[in-house]
Curated annotation (Swiss-Prot):
Disordered as annotated region, ranges: 884-908, 943-1000
A GO cellular component entry from the record: plasma membrane
Record-given protein name: UPF0182 protein SCO5204
Signal peptide span: none
Keyword Transmembrane: yes
Pfam families: UPF0182 (PF03699)
Family: Belongs to the UPF0182 family.
């Protein structure tokens, strides 16, 4: 019969006693080891951070932030612990004597008896917990504290309260933090005190008689009085907060500042509520003498009712019956304040807006053609498309790579600046032959060399004209340190300088090795350092590997942006760091901003959204992804450099008038160098930053107007057009371009964009900023505003026109033959003699090609469109005239003109002649739309060009080496077959694709 549990146990009893001594010792040892491991891991994080900051010579940043956080943690943690602990202790001390116990008190007595032996420990535990939480929260306010302590006046006052802007930017955030801390301390104290009073009989719920003792009533009323007093302070600060309050307003998104209803309803309401709250607080304090809740409850109810009626209903009535019937007249004075403040806060107050006809009245076609060359050095090398071309022609080894988006800079040649597309041959660990810990972190440690090409020219095959190429790199840039230990693609750590040799680069003779000799990184000779990094990187081999020895240094935090962010955590970093060769070193140049969201009356914007465009959508490294907080003041106050070899970070003051930068310089003295320390060579490569320009252009879609009524009507609202060459629907990116605005006498390196009317595609304005640092006009924004009475095609319409013209569409279809892919380059806009010139390079990536080559150039002006092999030819066709003949100086290494017939090698001459014949035959077939003949001609062209290149290479070797043309064209060092470079359709053996001053 089964056991029902009612009888005595039938089996042997199992004794559960204390663990044996050995088990207890083992458990204790494991516990101690676990605690030590956790402690050492925490120490390792702290110690490695300290070593890193010391290695980059910014240890003061580490110590300042550390001590500030520690100070805030202990001060506010202690204040919170004392406030809560004191009120718990006081509530316990004020407990009533227990006599006749009700059922409620009998139930509570069990809890009182249970915690009696642990009261002190419980009190310490509660106060420690709330203190830790409060201290951790306060330590996160270290920026707010430093800005309040070191705040520098702006020298400008808000139009409502006549207070310096620094009050809103530096003081008000700290006061609000203190207020929030006070509320938290009081609320927690009230809850803790009420629970203690209830536990010990000071408050009763079901017991007969008074619900609260006099002592409990007095204690809680004082706490509630403090709470209401803090609410009075909050009402008073809210008055000033109206100047930086965001609200919905039809005139603009993210409106900031007072409007009519704020100044005439909310502002007096806040003042009245402040007075009521003060009276209510006094009534709560009065219960110490009156011992009754009647008056405080009445006062508190009055305050709540007033908040609803005066703070909510009254402003709504003012808005409904005073503002809405006559909104334009009521809001106009406040809109004027917002216009002035926003334009000043974003640095757009000096924007020069000029009327521009949009259509040329010039009848002289020859003049138009000549002016087109003078108006801009049109960049037909799109840095956002030709990275695969750099990769194929100049990668050299699989463990090198170029960035997805190349950069545009200026380099002087023969005393003249030329727009240059530049990229670094960085390390690509994904391409190393064999992956293991030694290869990943010891042997393959750095990239090698700069590759640069002219932005305005291509060679006869549509490839870049390299001004710096090969491995090691050689060309116009001269001698410089080519090793790249710090770059945008270098995201893992490397250990260098020790017994293990590094792969430097490879050539035809084999691999070259190298050992790092710089002072970058942290020394690993110390075993404590090795143990700390082994723990920090979760890699025990760092501790015991024989590949680490005397002189070994660990390099990490190697991208330019993260290095600048680490040494200047108070700066906002631009999304695009770019390289430049400066004083014999490769320097990464990083633009950095100071921001605040406390500029009164200035509308806010979100950097992460405002700076997004068609480039950042597909390349997160270019986006300001961390900046989703809103700001309403921004300055490009710092230019930073990061040495690609040593990793040295230098911060240079750029905006010498910025009060936010002055504040941070006081907080971190010695971290930012004076503007005068910028060398002349570095100054030549500084430029106007893209992200600041994108923020400003977004604001200028509305804030280009200065009249309040026009602003309110929204009749002149613009928008940044979508990128017409991209189907993503993202905004068109701004473009760097050497060009000339109507009021300029010569071309200037500029950053440009276009605007269209809101919801429409025609052009409404063109905007350019002088981007060349060191010039008197640097940062000057010019807007050409087109008349609303005439319609000028915008970028999307021009692109549609390109695609819809029958001849162009047919040519594009032919170019797409044979599995080829057509890619449209940047659609550039250039003001020209009252009209607007559009230029768009067209690239073809053949079915058997891995990279795009320039094949055609689209040009549009005044409704006329051309689709030709070269920019010159397209301009000639659009204007119906040729440019005036100008003598071009010889440019060594240029392969942009017709293949020279001066070769003494008959094989070369014969091959070039055959190539020209094949090219002519292909063009004729293209015009006749004979695909079969066109394909045959392209095959003949490829064979002829291959024969010419092979013959020329043999001739060069016989003469003692390769010539400059081979270098610029990208020779066999790229590892690809030369014939594949010409396999794309419509290869052009003659003509120059360049334009402007560099065309020939």
């Amino acid at each position: 019969m089964p056991d029902r549990g009612g009888g005595p146990p039938t089996g042997p009893r199992i004794r559960v006693g204390r663990p044996s001594r050995r088990v207890r010792t083992l458990l204790l040892t494991l516990g101690v080891l676990a605690v030590l491991a956790m402690a050492f891991t925490m120490f390792a994080g702290f110690w490695t951070d300290w070593l890193w900051y010391r290695s980059v010579h910014y240890s003061s940043v580490f110590t300042t932030t550390l001590w500030t956080k520690i100070g805030l943690f202990f001060v506010f943690g202690l204040l919170m612990a004392l406030a809560v602990g004191f009120n718990i202790w006081l509530a316990h001390r004020l407990r009533p004597p227990l006599s006749a116990m009700s059922m409620e008190q009998q139930n509570l007595d069990r809890y009182r008896m249970g915690i009696a032996p642990y009261k002190k420990w419980l009190l310490l535990g509660i106060t420690a917990l709330v203190g830790l939480i409060a201290g951790a929260s306060a330590s996160g306010q270290w920026r707010t504290w430093l800005m309040w302590v070191n705040g520098v006046p702006f020298g400008q006052k808000d139009p409502q309260f006549k207070l310096d802007v620094s009050f809103y930017a530096f003081d008000l955030p700290w006061y609000r933090f203190l207020l929030g801390f006070g509320f938290a301390a009081v609320i927690i104290s009230v809850i803790a005190a009420a629970l203690t009073h209830y536990l010990y009989g000071g408050l009763r719920v079901t017991s007969p008689g008074a619900r609260a003792t006099a002592a409990a009533t007095g204690h809680l009323s004082v706490l509630l009085g403090v709470f209401v007093a803090l609410k009075a302070v909050a009402y008073w600060l809210d008055r000033y907060g109206l100047a930086v309050k965001s609200s919905d307003f039809k005139a603009t998104d993210n409106w900031t500042g007072l409007r009519y209803v704020d100044a005439n309803a909310y502002l007096p309401a806040k003042t009245i509520l402040f007075c009521i709250a003060v009276i209510c607080a006094l009534l709560f304090f009065a219960t110490l003498w009156r011992r009754t809740w009647q008056l405080p409850v009445i006062g508190f109810g009055l305050m709540v009712l007033s908040a609803i009626l005066i703070g909510g209903l009254y402003p709504a009535l003012v808005q409904k019956f005073q503002v809405q019937p006559n909104e334009q007249a009521k809001e106009a004075p406040y809109v004027e304040k917002n216009l002035a403040a926003t334009r000043d806060a974003y640095g757009i107050e000096g924007t020069q807006v000029a009327e521009y006809p949009g259509k040329s009245e010039t009848k002289d076609k020859t003049k138009l053609r000549d002016d087109a060359d003078a108006a801009a050095s049109v960049r037909i090398m799109d840095p956002n498309i030709i990275s695969p071309t750099f990769q194929q022609l100049q990668q050299m080894r699989n463990y090198y790579a170029f960035p997805t988006n190349l950069d545009v800079d200026r380099y002087a040649k023969d005393g003249k600046d030329q727009d240059t597309v530049i990229g670094l041959r960085e390390l690509n660990l994904a391409g190393i032959p064999k992956k293991n810990w030694i290869n990943n972190h010891f042997r393959y440690t750095h990239g090698y060399g700069v590759v640069a090409a002219k932005g305005t020219q291509v060679d006869s095959e549509g490839r870049p004209v390299f001004t710096e190429s090969n491995l090691p790199s050689e060309g116009d840039l001269g001698k410089y340190e080519q090793r790249i230990y710090y770059g945008e693609k270098t995201t893992t750590y490397s250990i260098v300088g020790g017994p293990q040799k590094e792969i430097d680069y490879s050539d035809d003779t084999g691999e070259k090795t190298f050992s790092y000799k710089g002072d970058g990184g942290v020394d690993l000779s110390n075993p404590i350092n090795r143990a700390a990094y082994a723990a920090a990187f979760s890699e025990p081999q760092i501790l015991y590997s024989g590949a680490i020895g005397d002189g070994s240094r660990i390099l990490y935090n190697r991208t330019p942006k993260e290095r600048v962010e680490a040494v200047a955590p108070w700066l906002t970093i631009d999304g695009d760091a770019y390289p430049a060769v400066v004083d014999g070193r490769i320097q990464w140049i990083v633009d950095a901003y100071t921001t605040t969201n406390g500029y009164p009356y200035a509308s806010r914007t979100t950097l992460g959204d405002t700076t997004a465009d068609s480039l950042t959508a597909n390349n997160n490294s270019r986006a300001v992804v961390a900046q989703q907080n809103q700001v309403n003041y921004i300055r490009n106050s710092v230019k930073a450099t990061v040495d690609a070899y040593s990793g040295d970070v230098k911060l240079y003051e750029w905006d010498t008038q910025d009060p936010v930068l002055k504040t941070w310089k006081k907080a971190f003295p010695g971290t930012v160098q004076d503007k005068g320390e910028i060398s002349k060579e570095l100054m030549a490569h500084l430029r106007y930053p893209q992200d600041l320009f994108k923020v400003q252009r977004e604001l200028l879609t509305r804030y280009h107007v200065k009249d309040a009524n026009t602003f309110l009507s929204g009749s002149e609202v613009w928008q940044v057009p979508d990128d017409p060459t991209n189907k993503s629907g993202d905004a068109v990116p701004p473009y760097y371009l050497s060009m000339k605005m109507p009021d300029q006498k010569a071309q200037a390196f500029s950053l440009t964009t276009t605007f269209t009317p809101n919801g429409r595609d025609n052009l409404s304005a063109f905007m350019a900023v002088d981007a060349e640092a060191g010039t008197s006009d640097y940062g000057k924004i010019r807007i050409l505003k087109l008349p609303t009475s005439t319609t000028v095609d915008g970028p999307k319409q021009v692109q549609s026109q390109f695609n819809s013209e029958q001849d162009i569409a047919e040519s594009i279809r032919l170019l797409r033959g044979g599995d080829s892919e057509v890619e449209y380059g940047n659609l550039l806009t250039v003001p020209l003699d009252g009209g607007l010139l559009y230029v768009e390079p067209v690239y073809v990536r053949g079915g058997d090609l891995k990279y795009p080559l320039l094949r055609k150039v689209l040009v549009s002006y005044g409704g006329n469109t051309a689709f030709e092999n070269t920019l010159d030819a397209a301009l000639n066709k659009v204007f119906g005239a040729q440019a005036a003949e100008t003598e071009q100086p010889p440019d060594e290494g240029d392969d942009t003109t017709e293949p020279p017939p001066t070769s003494t090698n008959p094989t070369v001459r014969e091959a070039l002649s055959d190539a020209q014949k094949a090219f002519d035959a292909g063009q004729k077939a293209l015009e006749q739309k004979d695909l079969a003949a066109y394909a045959e001609a392209q095959k003949d062209l490829e064979e002829a060009l291959q024969r010419a290149e092979d013959a020329q290479a043999k001739a060069d070797q016989g003469a003692g080496g390769k010539n400059g043309d081979d270098k610029n064209a990208g020779d066999k060092n790229s590892g690809d077959k030369a014939g594949s470079d010409k396999a794309g359709p419509d290869a052009t053996p003659t003509g120059d694709a360049g334009g402007g001053a560099d065309t020939g």
